[in-house]
Amino acid sequence: MLKGLYTATSAMIAQQRRTEMLSNNIANANTSGYKADQGSMRAFPEMLLSRIESKSPAGTSRTEIGSVNTGVYMQELKPLFTQGSLKSTDQPTDIALIENQVPMSAETNEKAALFYPVQTADGIRYSKSSTFSLNENNQLTINGRPILSTDRQPITVDNENFTVSENGTVTTNGRTAGQIDVRMAEDVRNLKRDGNDLYSTADGNDLPSAAGNNQVAYSLKQGVSELSNVDVTSAYTEMTEAYRSFEANQKVIQAYDKSMDKAANEIGKI
């Protein structure tokens, strides 16, 4: 009896995690460059049931009577790195990173992904956000974190009257302030989310620069913002499915609770 209780409980926990993932995706639907998390349900290994043959002298002969599933769990979440829609804003601090060509991993059949490197207190992190701003030192930043140039230095401009070419060269008042660096993750499985807008590498190593890589073609578009790739309609539909599944397993647990209560309080009186 308890096996069924454990199975229903694991399903509730899995659906709760799924709901949290979908809620976070929906909450960031309007966040520039946000990449939707995705996850899939997996079953725990099945347990093989058998019984001991009572006629066997040694009592060691067994007959298989079937198997039982021991529950489900939600696999580790991973972002979906497909490019979001592009929106023209005419704001000089909106700079979209457009992936024209990136290599495909032969092992995972997934495309590589390009990122802006930013400097944080914990080291270099990587962002897909296209919304830039200037800090008090007139450095180009993403959410207050300086964007690094190909020389691994922050890029300082005189004011918001600067231009960015398609290869990332920043010009302000007639001088070149630097070239915005772009890094490439060949295997996106090596990335882990660090907050909603940053990523880091699982092994702690820096991503290689995409500049000069003949397998990569990209362009930077000033005055253009990349939107999130969250499909809000699909997310709400999945949210409804998760709620219904959660409630169904909740009812199963309530039924088990009533059965165990009857076994403990009524059958025990006989």
Curated annotation (Swiss-Prot):
Leader sequence segment: none
A cellular-component GO term for this protein: bacterial-type flagellum
Keywords assigned: Bacterial flagellum biogenesis
GO biological process entries: bacterial-type flagellum organization; bacterial-type flagellum-dependent swarming motility
Family: Belongs to the flagella basal body rod proteins family.
Function: Not required for motility.
Name assigned to this protein: Flagellar hook-basal body complex protein FlhO
Gene: flhO
